[in-house]
Amino acid sequence: MSRDDLARLEEACVKAWDQHDADGFASLLTEDCVVIDDMEPKPLRSRDAARRYAESWFTAFPDMRVQEKNRVIGDDGMAVELELKGTNTGPLEMGGTRLAPTGRRITAGVNVFMKARGGRIREIHSHSDSLSMMSQLGLAGSSAPA
């Protein structure tokens, strides 16, 4: 894939998340994709598991917006810095635990690294500022303003 193709793939991924389009997100992935998220107990190892993962975030934060802050496109992958903003009004699936909605608003940074194969994303590594997110939700330490 060219760097322009990779850039378009990354843009489509961010757009799918911003528009809460779990099926659109899943369509960008290889069937055997792997999603590794710091807040998940183990890697997700299929397109369907990745779709369910996205749906869980859209349920937890139905007003969530995703904005790209920075990106780097390489020969076979992309790195993107994102900012997530939303209100936790639905149950949050995190680390194998289901957390009740807090009603609190968050602003959180997420760094995502993606590898591509054959025009689709084959691997995603997501690293979020989980301490800040949990604090803003009132679930860890002092609560920072959103």
Predicted regions: what they are:
Residues 1-146:
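C-terminal and inter-domain tail/linker signature
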